C-alpha cells in the first residue's frame, strides 16, 4: 500500500517546479480510475455481511449498489463538463477528496441509511473524478504510439479494478471486516490526493459552455425515485399510494429532465443526437442489455454466500473465471467486428449472455460449482464483453467526429442507468418470489434459490428482447480494421467519456501496428473504439 514516505521519496526525485515525467502523471490518473472501478465491484461480496451487521432488508440491500450507480450515472457527464470549465486537475482533486471522505464515512457507518448516503456521495465523487482521468492521460502524452500505450494502460487498469473487485473484497471481508472494502480507499486515496496535488498538471478546454446542473439533478433524482417506487411494489403492491406516488414522481422528474434538455443552451444530454439511428438504437440496446447484465454479480454473490455457504473469499474466488471472461470478450470483439460486423457481434454476445442467464436460472440449493456458478458465469460475462464494444462503436459511428466523446459518454450512462433500474426490478422480483416460497413452507435456502432463479430467468428474457431490438433496429455494417487511438483531451473530458467498469473496456491498438492510419482511416471514438461507417 502506498505510504507518505513514498510521496516524500518521489518528491526528492522531482522537485517542486520541475515538470513531472509523463509516466508519473499517467500513474496518478490510473490510480484514480482504479479506485472508481474497483468500488463498483468490491462491495458485492460484502453485501451479506453488511446486511447482517446493519440490519438491512433484502430489498434494501440493492441500494448499496444502486446508490453509487445512480449518482455516478446521473452526474458523470456533468463531471466531464466541469473539468473543462474549472480544470481537469481541480476536478480530479475535488472528486478524489469527496470519494475518499465518503469511503471513510461509509466504513464507519452504524446504520443502513448512513451507509447508503455515503455510497451516494461516493458515486458523486466518482462522477467528478473519473472523466478527468482519461483526459489527464491523453493531455500528458504526445499523440501517436506513446499515447496509444498510455490509453491501453488506462483501460487495463480499469479492467484490473473490475476483475479484482470480488477477490479484493473477499480477502478484506474474511480477514478484517466488510468495513474495509470502503476503508481501504482512505489511505490509498490520501496518498494519490497528495501526490496529485503536487505533480498533476492543470489543463482546461477552451469551450466555456455552462454547466447543466438542473439536468444532472433532475435525471439523478428521477432515476432514484423511480427505482425506489419499483422496490416498494414487493411490500406494498402496485396499487398502493406508497408505490404509485414515487413511480409517478420519478416519471415526472424524468419528463421534466427531457424538457430542460430540449430548452437549455448547453444540455447535459443533447436530444438531437438521438435523431441518428445508430446513436438511438445503440443506446437503447445498451440500456436494455445493461439492465440484465449489471445484476449478475449482485445475485451470484448472494447465491454463493446465502445459499451455498461460501465465505466472502470463496465467493470472490468463485467469480474470478467470470471476471476473466469479460476481459476475453472485450479483447476479442474488435477482432471479430471487421469480419462479422458490429451488429452481429453484439447480437452473438447478447445471445451468449442470454444462454448463460438461462443456464444460471436452473440453479439449485445444493448447487455444484462448475455447472451452477462457473460455466454459466463465464457465458454471461463473455457475452457481456462481446456486446459492449460493438455497441459503443455503432453509437459513435452515428455521431459527427466532434461528438464522438459525448456519444461514448452517453453509451456508458445508458448502461449504468439501465443497470440501476434493472437491479431495482430484479431485486423486487426475487424478493417477492422468495417471500411466496417461504409462505409455502419452503426452507430458506430453497426459497432464496427460487427468488434468484426467477431473477436470472427474467434477465434471460430481457436479453432475448434485446436481441430482437438489435436485429430490427441497429444499422448493419462491418467494422473497420485496427486504428490509431487518436484521443482528443477536450472531448474525452467534456463529454464524460469514461470506462465505468470492466464491461466497457475497449481494445486500443498501438500506432505502429496500424497500417496507413496516419492522416486517414476511420474516425476513432475518444474511448479508443474504432468508429466505423454503417449503412443507415
Show where each model-derived region lies.
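Transmembrane-helix bundle of Major Facilitator Superfamily
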Residues: 2-198, 340, 351-354, 358-361, ...
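Transmembrane helix-loop junctions in multipass membrane proteins, especially transporters and channels
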Residues: 111, 143, 174-175, 197-206, ...
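Structural signature of transmembrane alpha-helices in multi-pass secondary transporters
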Residues: 36, 65-68, 72, 99, ...
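Hydrophobic transmembrane-helix bundles of small-molecule transporters
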Residues: 152, 174-286, 292, 310-311, ...
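Transmembrane-helix exit segments and adjacent C-terminal regions of multi-pass membrane proteins
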Residues: 2-31, 382, 393, 443-536
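12-transmembrane solute porter fold
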Residues: 22-45, 58, 241-253, 262-437, ...
Amino acid at each position: 500500500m502506498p505510504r507518505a514516505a513514498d510521496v516524500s521519496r518521489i518528491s526528492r526525485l522531482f522537485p517542486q517546479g520541475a515538470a513531472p515525467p509523463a509516466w508519473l502523471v499517467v500513474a496518478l490518473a490510473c490510480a484514480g480510475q482504479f479506485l472508481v472501478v474497483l468500488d463498483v465491484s468490491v462491495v458485492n461480496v460484502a453485501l451479506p455481511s453488511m446486511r447482517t451487521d446493519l440490519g438491512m432488508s433484502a430489498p434494501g440491500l440493492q441500494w448499496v449498489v444502486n446508490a453509487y450507480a445512480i449518482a455516478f450515472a446521473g452526474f458523470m457527464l456533468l463531471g466531464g463538463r466541469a473539468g473543462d470549465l474549472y480544470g481537469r486537475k481541480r476536478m480530479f482533486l475535488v472528486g478524489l477528496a469527496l470519494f475518499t471522505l465518503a469511503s471513510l464515512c461509509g466504513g464507519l457507518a452504524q446504520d443502513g441509511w448512513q451507509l447508503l448516503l455515503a455510497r451516494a456521495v461516493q458515486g458523486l465523487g466518482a462522477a467528478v473524478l473519473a472523466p478527468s482521468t482519461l483526459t489527464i492521460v491523453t493531455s500528458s502524452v504526445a499523440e501517436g504510439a506513446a499515447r496509444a500505450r498510455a490509453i491501453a494502460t488506462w483501460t487495463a487498469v480499469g479492467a484490473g479494478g473490475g476483475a479484482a473487485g470480488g477477490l479484493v473484497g473477499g480477502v478484506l471481508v474474511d480477514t478484517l471486516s466488510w468495513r474495509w472494502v470502503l476503508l481501504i480507499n482512505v489511505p490509498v486515496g490520501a496518498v494519490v490526493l497528495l501526490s496529485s496535488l503536487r505533480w498533476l498538471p492543470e489543463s482546461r478546454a477552451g469551450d466555456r459552455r455552462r454547466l447543466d446542473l438542473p439536468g444532472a439533478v433532475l435525471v439523478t433524482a428521477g432515476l432514484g425515485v423511480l427505482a425506489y417506487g419499483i422496490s416498494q411494489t414487493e411490500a406494498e403492491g402496485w396499487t398502493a399510494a406508497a408505490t404509485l406516488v414515487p413511480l409517478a414522481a420519478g416519471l415526472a422528474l424524468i419528463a421534466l429532465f427531457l424538457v430542460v434538455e430540449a430548452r437549455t443552451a448547453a444540455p447535459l444530454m443533447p436530444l438531437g443526437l438521438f435523431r441518428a439511428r445508430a446513436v438511438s438504437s445503440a443506446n437503447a440496446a445498451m440500456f436494455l442489455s445493461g439492465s440484465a447484465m449489471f445484476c449478475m454479480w449482485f445475485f451470484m454473490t448472494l447465491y454463493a454466500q446465502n445459499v451455498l455457504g461460501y465465505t466472502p473469499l470463496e465467493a470472490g474466488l468463485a467469480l474470478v473465471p467470470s471476471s476473466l471472461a469479460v476481459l476475453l470478450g472485450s479483447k476479442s470483439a474488435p477482432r471479430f467486428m471487421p469480419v462479422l460486423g458490429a451488429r452481429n457481434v453484439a447480437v452473438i454476445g447478447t445471445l451468449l449472455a442470454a444462454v448463460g442467464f438461462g443456464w444460471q436460472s436452473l440453479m439449485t440449493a445444493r448447487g455444484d460449482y462448475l455447472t451452477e456458478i462457473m460455466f454459466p458465469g463465464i457465458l454471461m460475462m463473455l457475452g457481456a464483453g462481446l456486446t459492449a464494444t460493438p455497441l459503443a462503436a455503432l453509437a459513435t459511428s452515428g455521431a459527427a467526429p466532434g461528438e464522438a466523446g459525448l456519444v461514448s459518454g452517453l453509451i456508458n450512462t445508458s448502461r449504468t442507468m439501465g443497470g440501476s433500474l434493472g437491479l431495482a426490478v430484479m431485486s423486487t422480483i426475487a424478493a417477492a418470489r422468495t417471500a411466496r416460497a417461504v409462505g409455502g413452507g419452503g426452507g430458506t435456502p430453497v426459497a432464496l434459490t427460487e427468488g434468484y432463479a426467477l431473477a436470472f430467468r427474467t434477465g434471460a428474457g430481457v436479453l432475448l428482447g434485446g436481441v430482437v431490438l438489435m436485429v430490427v433496429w441497429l444499422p448493419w455494417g462491418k467494422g473497420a480494421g485496427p486504428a490509431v487511438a487518436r484521443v482528443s483531451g477536450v472531448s474525452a473530458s467534456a463529454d464524460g467519456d469514461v470506462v465505468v467498469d470492466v464491461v466497457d473496456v475497449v481494445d486500443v491498438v498501438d500506432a505502429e501496428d496500424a497500417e496507413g492510419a496516419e492522416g486517414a482511416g476511420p474516425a476513432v471514438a475518444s474511448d479508443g473504439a474504432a468508429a466505423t461507417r454503417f449503412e443507415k
